[in-house]
């Protein structure tokens, strides 16, 4: 009798194990078959990297910056195409304004040397700490004007941030197009992928 109960118990356990395994496989299949958005797919591909921190050295057109971001230490190469900006208003600054000890955010190419520290072409160097009062560099991948014409929605080339820009942020918002480079000021972002925000101010560079 005891042997019969043991056999029955083992059979029941095996049945439950099989059923649980089948349910797990079914759930995995359902997850795998869910569509993956384009924004999520491109999270691993960064068109623009950034580091926020302090200038350690200035060597001709190369700024050595230590801080936080995609790289803790980076040598940013300033070219004729690099935007040198005041983070408070988006106005252009001279390279001489970027001195050792200044707080900056540098936006740079993912194409980097293998040296230590790595070197990369700087797209923009923004003077000021990385607070809400300091604008963020934004390369426009897509721009879509609302049907009622009251705002434009832009997504950056990293496809990590979608921003809504209206006439309060920029009076010529309707003229913003793909390929433009912007400075954006905003308070908060959603936790979605991509993140979303409403711009308080937008400057076309």
Predicted regions and their residues:
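Hydrophobic h-region of N-terminal signal peptides that target proteins for export
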Residues: 14-20
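Low-complexity "stalk/linker" and mucin-like segments enriched in Ser/Thr/Pro/Ala/Gly
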Residues: 83-86
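A short macromolecule-binding patch
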Residues: 71-81, 159-167
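Short, flexible, surface-exposed loop segments at domain boundaries
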Residues: 2-9, 20-70, 88-157, 168-205
């Amino acid at each position: 009798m005891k042997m019969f109960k043991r056999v029955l118990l083992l059979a029941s356990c095996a049945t439950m194990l099989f059923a649980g395994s089948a349910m797990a496989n079914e759930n995995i299949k359902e997850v795998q078959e869910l569509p993956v958005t384009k924004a999520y797919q491109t999270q691993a591909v960064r068109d623009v990297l950034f580091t926020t921190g302090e200038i350690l050295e200035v060597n001709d057109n190369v700024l050595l910056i230590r801080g936080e971001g995609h790289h803790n230490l980076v040598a940013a190469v300033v070219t004729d195409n690099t935007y040198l900006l005041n983070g408070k208003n988006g106005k252009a600054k001279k390279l001489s304004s970027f001195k050792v000890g200044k707080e900056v955010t540098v936006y740079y190419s993912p194409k980097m040397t293998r040296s230590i520290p790595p070197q990369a072409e700087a797209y923009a160097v923004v003077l000021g700490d990385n607070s809400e009062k300091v604008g963020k560099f934004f390369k426009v991948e897509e721009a879509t004007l609302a049907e009622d014409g009251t705002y434009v929605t832009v997504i950056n080339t990293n496809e990590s941030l979608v921003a809504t820009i209206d006439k309060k942020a920029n009076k010529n918002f309707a003229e913003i197009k793909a390929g433009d480079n912007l400075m954006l000021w905003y308070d908060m972002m959603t936790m979605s992928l991509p993140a979303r925000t409403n711009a308080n101010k937008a400057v076309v560079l």
